[in-house]
């Protein structure tokens, strides 16, 4: 989805520009949990804290930013696993969202995205 990729690219750039970068964070904005959390929040992924809704909205992003069907399926599985794991513990909705985002990034989903291939 070219339009979704364009908007997400813009959101990532804006989030990377406006969020303070800590010394220990990677230079690449695509490797930063705070940048992805910010960009996904702008897309409304975390508006409703219900785990089923978060899972559905995150999963819907997979085919928008990944072109290989096998990678899309892997993305959806990772999203499901991360949402299930990170919503078990009592935390604020914001912290759960950040943890879900981090879990997805650590699983290597970003490397399969169109955005990562453009570098």
Curated annotation (Swiss-Prot):
Keyword Disulfide bond applies: yes
Protein known as: Venom allergen 2
Subcellular location: Secreted
Keywords linked to the UniProt accession: Allergen, Disulfide bond, Secreted
Keyword match Repeat: no
Superkingdom in the source lineage: Eukaryota
Disulfide bonds: none
Gene Ontology cellular-component terms listed: extracellular region
Main location: secreted
Tissue expression remark: Expressed by the venom gland.
Family that this chain belongs to: Belongs to the ant venom allergen 2/4 family.
UniProt source species: Solenopsis richteri (Black imported fire ant)
Subunit structure: Homodimer; disulfide-linked.
Signal sequence annotation: none
């Amino acid at each position: 989805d070219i339009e979704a990729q364009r908007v997400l690219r813009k959101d990532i750039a804006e989030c990377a520009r406006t969020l303070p970068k800590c010394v220990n964070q990677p230079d690449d904005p695509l490797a930063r949990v705070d940048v992805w959390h910010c960009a996904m929040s702008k897309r409304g992924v975390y508006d409703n804290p219900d785990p089923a809704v978060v899972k559905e909205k995150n999963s819907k992003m997979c085919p928008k930013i990944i072109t290989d069907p096998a990678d899309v399926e892997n993305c959806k599985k990772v999203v499901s696993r991360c949402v299930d794991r990170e919503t078990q513990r009592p935390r604020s909705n914001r912290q759960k969202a950040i943890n879900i985002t981090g879990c997805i990034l650590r699983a290597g989903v970003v490397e399969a995205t169109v955005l990562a291939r453009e570098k």
